A protein has these predicted regions:
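Helical "lid/coupling" subdomains associated with nucleotide-phosphate turnover
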Residues: 1-6, 14, 40, 47-48, ...
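Phosphate/pyrophosphate-binding loops at sites that engage ATP/ADP/AMP, CoA/4′-phosphopantetheine
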Residues: 2, 69-81
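Gly/Thr-rich phosphate-binding beta-strand-loop-beta motif of the actin/hexokinase/Hsp70
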Residues: 2-37, 83-86, 95
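Amphipathic alpha-helical transducer elements in NTP-driven molecular machines
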Residues: 22, 62-66, 77
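Short glycine-rich, Thr/Ser-proximal phosphate-binding strand/loop in the N-terminal lobe
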Residues: 22-56, 100-101
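Short, well-ordered amphipathic alpha-helices
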Residues: 26-29, 66-70
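Short beta-strand-loop/turn "lid" adjacent to the catalytic site in phosphate-handling enzymes
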Residues: 50, 77-101
């Protein structure tokens, strides 16, 4: 992965967070002039608080999210203020929410 260090304003940065049974992954990127997503950095942590798509230990899950987001921040050099988060499973419901990251 080539290192691209540009100064962006937060609306230009796109951050995805995936909380899964085996890993928690974060990716940081932006849309380039051609409309393609350029990856600036990523983070990955073991998911120890999720089983079969269900969060059974919120503290372990939060710890994994913090590790993944911190790694993505360190690798991308970008401030992460907002994320698009996803978690798959049978018993989830969806709502729009905002809070500290």
């Amino acid at each position: 992965m080539k290192k691209v260090r540009k100064e962006f304003t937060n609306p230009d940065i796109i951050v995805g967070l995936d909380i899964g049974t085996t890993k928690i992954a974060t990716i940081v990127g932006y849309k380039n002039e051609e409309g393609r997503i350029e990856v600036l950095g990523y983070g990955k942590a073991e998911s120890t608080g999720v089983q079969h798509g269900l969060i059974f230990n919120i503290n372990k899950t939060v710890h994994g999210v913090e590790q993944s987001v911190t790694m993505a921040h360190d690798r991308s050099g970008q401030q992460i203020d907002e994320v698009y988060a996803g978690i798959a499973g049978r018993h989830q419901s969806v709502r729009r929410s905002a809070g500290p990251l």
